């Protein structure tokens, strides 16, 4: 029989999504929001906060152009944009105690650009493979990347380019003028629902329109500032409690990791015949951490 418990607000790493047309201000907005997160976490100045942010740049080095706003950390990821590359980068950053926020700019490249999921699937189809089977294979790869983002202990802000359209609209002077709208993210449908909050960034004004919010947020922010980051962090963490993992939960995690990575013998050797559930929470958490480190070493050797 299931056990019911009272719903409680739990502390968790925040995942935010910003999408919009090229030059709408996604990168700048993400860095400002990330800065607010860090200020709220560490109680530091705006200048100091950038030291605890890392930007993963897929935009051909454009992410470094914002260096004038602060000394954030920077990693460039180049084509081919295989999902495994991003997973490895995130896993490395997860172990860095000085980093609080990861900005991924942008996730679109791992979906529709050179070496991304769509191109890999097209190549597999051209070699005579079954299209349905190929989708299963590459959907699994994409899902593994999304899982790495969502399961990261860091706060993560993700950007994506938007498929856009330009239409004639009446401006504030009563004249017709072209306006570019970001219609939908150039990414697998539904990704925005995986995140805690989503902004559609307007190209002309850099205004952030809220499409998914944390309770208490307004519908429009113009422009993005560190204060917006502080607000989001405060709304998400106010009266929240630290989540406590249970022994059975960690045991299931260990079983899954060891099975997926052919590490069952390692776990059995570490247990010396003891059942997983007989370990204390401290012992089983250490085993999980050691197992993850061994998996990373194994992947590097490949």
Region locations from a protein language model:
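Phosphate-binding/switch region of NTP-binding enzymes
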Residues: 19-23, 147-231
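Conserved inter-motif catalytic segment of the P-loop NTP-binding fold
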Residues: 21, 47-140
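Interfaces that engage single-stranded nucleic acids at replication/repair/recombination sites
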Residues: 1-20, 24-26, 30, 35, ...
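Post-Walker A helix-loop "phosphate-sensing" segment adjacent to the P-loop in P-loop NTPases
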Residues: 35-53
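Helical mechanochemical/support elements of P-loop NTPase systems and associated helical scaffolds
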Residues: 82-85, 131-145, 149, 183, ...
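Hydrophobic helix-cap positions at the C-terminus of alpha-helices
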Residues: 37, 93-96, 149-152
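Glycine-rich phosphate-binding loop used to anchor ATP phosphates in small-molecule kinases
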Residues: 99-109, 135-166
């Amino acid at each position: 029989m299931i056990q019911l418990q009272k719903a409680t607000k739990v502390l968790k790493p925040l995942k935010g999504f910003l999408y919009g047309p090229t030059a709408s201000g996604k990168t700048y907005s993400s860095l400002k929001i990330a800065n607010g997160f860090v200020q709220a976490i560490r109680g530091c100045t705006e200048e100091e906060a950038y030291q605890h942010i890392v930007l993963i740049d897929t935009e051909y080095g454009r992410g470094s152009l914002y260096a004038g706003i602060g000394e954030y950390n920077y990693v460039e990821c180049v084509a081919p944009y295989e999902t495994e590359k991003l997973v490895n980068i995130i896993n490395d950053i997860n172990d860095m105690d000085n980093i609080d926020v990861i900005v991924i700019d942008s996730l679109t490249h791992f979906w529709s650009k050179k070496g991304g999921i769509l191109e890999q699937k097209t190549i597999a189809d051209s070699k005579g493979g079954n299209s349905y089977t190929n989708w299963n294979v590459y959907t699994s790869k994409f899902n593994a990347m999304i899982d790495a983002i969502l399961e990261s202990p860091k706060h993560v802000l993700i950007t994506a380019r938007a498929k856009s359209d330009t239409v004639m609209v009446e401006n504030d002077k009563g004249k017709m003028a072209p306006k570019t709208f970001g219609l939908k993210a150039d990414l697998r449908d539904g990704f925005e629902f995986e995140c805690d909050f989503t902004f559609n960034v307007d190209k002309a004004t850099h205004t952030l329109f809220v499409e998914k919010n944390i309770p208490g947020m307004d519908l429009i922010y113009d422009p993005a500032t560190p204060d917006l980051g502080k607000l989001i962090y405060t709304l998400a963490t106010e009266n929240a409690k630290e989540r406590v993992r249970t022994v059975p939960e960690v045991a299931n995690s260990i079983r899954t990791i060891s099975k997926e990575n052919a590490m069952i013998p390692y776990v059995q050797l570490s247990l010396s015949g003891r059942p997983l559930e007989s370990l204390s929470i401290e012992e089983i958490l250490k085993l999980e951490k050691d197992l993850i480190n061994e998996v990373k070493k194994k992947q590097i050797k490949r």
